[in-house]
A protein has these predicted regions:
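Catalytic-core environment of secreted peptidases
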Residues: 64, 76-109
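N-terminal capping segment at the start of a domain
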Residues: 2-47, 308
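Midchain, well-structured core segments that form catalytic/ion-binding scaffolds
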Residues: 139-140, 144-266, 270
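A generic, well-ordered mixed alpha/beta core segment in the N-terminal half of proteins
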Residues: 98-171
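A non-catalytic alpha/beta surface segment that caps or lines the substrate-entry region
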Residues: 35-81
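Acidic, glycine-rich active-site loops and adjacent beta-strand->loop/helix elements
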Residues: 74-76, 96-98, 132-143, 205, ...
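Zn-dependent metallopeptidase/amidohydrolase metal-coordination segment
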Residues: 21-36, 93-94, 275-324, 333
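His/Asp/Glu-rich mid-to-C-terminal helical/loop segments that flank catalytic regions of hydrolases
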Residues: 238, 242-264, 300-337
Length: 337
């Protein structure tokens, strides 16, 4: 791992805030694409409604001065350049596809919170040392094509691209055909895109934060059926004449792996938000990103813990709070200049 993107304490940015009204308006605007009678959203992956949602988010990104790259599984990366474009970008996002009877916030919040970070930096006329990218991944939900977290899984090398293209829905339409139909099969090979660190803001999809009156959940892990022991292997060298930048130092890398969680906790504390550690009971694209780069997740409460449902709801105050934490964390890694 390059020492160029190791955690660096930021300038004092505690007073900086995202525009909560703008973020809320964007969430409500995107939710109109595929809106359901009960106030939810039905925007299945790689349908025309998905195309409309993608077009809208990309339009907003371009208005914010961002460049756009699409890979061969339809993952979309929107980039705000850094002062040092050679550094791997600090990336944040989620997904915009929904369940058949889904809500306004699942996935969409993570993408638009990340976009709001960029808009806020533009408002403040703040440049960053490292580039910042907003991503939305293809088919996180798995409600039309199986498996879930498809786009991030292909990106991480978990699912072979050509095999994934061949997966069909119940009508016999393949992923590859659907990508072609909506015009979102890009040129970049999935995975040929560096990531310095990855952060994902998300509704909790459970009742714990609301029950305990906590504003921020600092995600410690995602439940699964596999457990891993992580062994970081370095190379011994004389401590005196070998500078840190030329070492293969195992402790340095292991420390970096832990810093994302610490950064989120620190940001929540500095902003004065009640927070607690939490484990995610649902899967997220951040799982596969953790295979590739240091990764963190920020949870906010959702009413009654309800998600994957048309009545899914998060308050404007919590939506803004999570995005403010995301702003602080991304700045600690992208480094304002």
């Amino acid at each position: 791992m390059s020492s160029d993107v190791l955690f660096t304490p930021a300038t004092d940015t505690t007073g900086w805030r995202i525009n909560g009204d703008r973020l809320w308006a964007s969430l409500m605007d995107l939710a109109q694409i595929g809106a359901t009678p009960k106030g939810g959203c039905r925007r299945l992956t790689l349908t025309d409604l998905d195309r409309q949602g993608r077009d809208k988010v990309i339009g907003w990104a371009r208005e914010a001065g961002m460049s756009v790259t699409i890979d061969k599984i339809g993952n979309v990366f929107m980039r705000r350049e850094g002062r040092n474009p050679g550094l791997p970008p600090i990336v944040s996002g989620s997904h915009i596809d929904t369940q058949p009877t889904g809500g306004k916030f699942d996935g969409n919040y993570g993408v638009l919170a990340a976009l709001e970070v960029v808009r806020t930096l533009n408002d403040l006329q703040i440049a960053t040392e490292a580039p910042i990218e907003v991503v939305f991944w293809t088919n996180e939900e798995g409600s039309r094509f199986v498996p879930v977290m498809m786009g991030s899984g292909v990106f991480a090398g978990v699912f072979p691209l050509e095999e994934t293209w061949a997966v069909t829905d119940k009508e016999g339409v393949s992923v590859g055909e659907a990508l072609e139909q909506i015009g979102y099969i890009g040129e970049q090979t999935p995975g040929d895109h560096p990531i310095g660190a990855y952060f994902e803001a998300h509704i909790e999809q459970g009742p714990i934060l609301e029950d305990e009156a906590k504003t921020i959940g600092i995600v410690q892990g995602v439940l699964g059926i596999r457990w891993y022991d992580c062994v970081v292997t370095g190379q011994a060298s004389h401590a005196g004449p070998t500078p840190m930048r030329l070492r293969q130092d195992a402790l340095q890398v292991a420390t970096r792996i832990m810093q994302e969680v610490v950064a989120i906790a620190d940001a929540a504390q500095r902003l004065g938000y009640p927070a607690r550690p939490i484990v995610s009971g649902a899967g997220h694209d951040a799982v596969y990103m953790s295979y590739l780069a240091p990764t963190g997740m920020i949870f906010i409460p959702c009413k009654d813990g309800i998600s994957h449902n048309e009545i899914e709801y998060a308050s404007p105050e919590h939506v803004a709070a999570g995005a403010n934490v995301l702003l602080q964390v991304m700045l600690q890694y992208a480094r304002p200049v």
